[in-house]
Amino acid sequence: MGVAFDKCETRPANIDAILNGLDRYNPETTTVFQDYVVQQCEDRTFDCYANLALLKLYQFNPHLLQPETVTNILAKALTVFPSPAFSLCLALLPAHTQPFPATNDEAQAASQTSDFVESVQKLARLSTLLESAQYAQFWSTLNSDDLYADLVADVAGFEELVRIRIAVEVGKTFREITADVLEQWLDLRSREALEKFVVEVCSWELDKSAPAGTVVKVPTNKENEARSEVKSERVGIEQFGRVLRRGFEQAA
């Protein structure tokens, strides 16, 4: 069985004690969770369970909500795609922050807190692009507006973490991919930077003799291995006999 997506090996003991006790519902613990979010941003870790607990506290105590902390949680969730972390966090936010307000009241509330709502919706846009594997468009969108840069500024190594996640998804799908395409998907502006990332970070190989130009070769793994699969089912004679009898039975 795989490791749960919300499991965090680096979770401090005091945070674990709060999460496993009644204090997780105590509004006074919001400051502890908020400091923990700052720590996650600095040391490149992500604790989904703790972050969801903080967002739940915000849901019960709206006056305690800190927009910057929320956007940092969402930005961190982007670095662990394609896990459900981002959508789970988004679901705990006020209804008027959602990309598509359902009622006029929600739309009016959105206009009253437009900066926070705009930030949430921009991050939701980035999540959609990542989840739909539109990697080149993700980078172009991220680089298109200074607000995006501000939203991810507190997350140390944001771009590097996202590149690694994209590379993981590429490794599940491809055995070979042209360097030109991968360069766009990883937003690496030079061939030298791409080659360094591919070899040192991914441990993949480069074939510069291919007719189509430089090709990146991904080692075989259980996800990208092409294999035929034959499925069969065995039907016992008793089961088959019951089917035949039922076909001759007259309706009562």
Curated annotation (Swiss-Prot):
Predominant localisation class: cytoplasm
Compartment annotation: Cytoplasm
PCI domain segment(s): 46-225
Keywords attached to this entry: Cytoplasm, Initiation factor, Protein biosynthesis
Highest rank taxon of the organism: Eukaryota
Entry-linked InterPro entries: ARM-type_fold, CSN8_PSD8_EIF3K, eIF3k, PCI_dom, Transl_init_fac_sub12_N_euk, WH-like_DNA-bd_sf, WH_DNA-bd_sf
Molecular function GO labels: ribosome binding; RNA binding; translation initiation factor activity
Disulfide bonds: none
Protein name per Swiss-Prot or TrEMBL: Eukaryotic translation initiation factor 3 subunit K
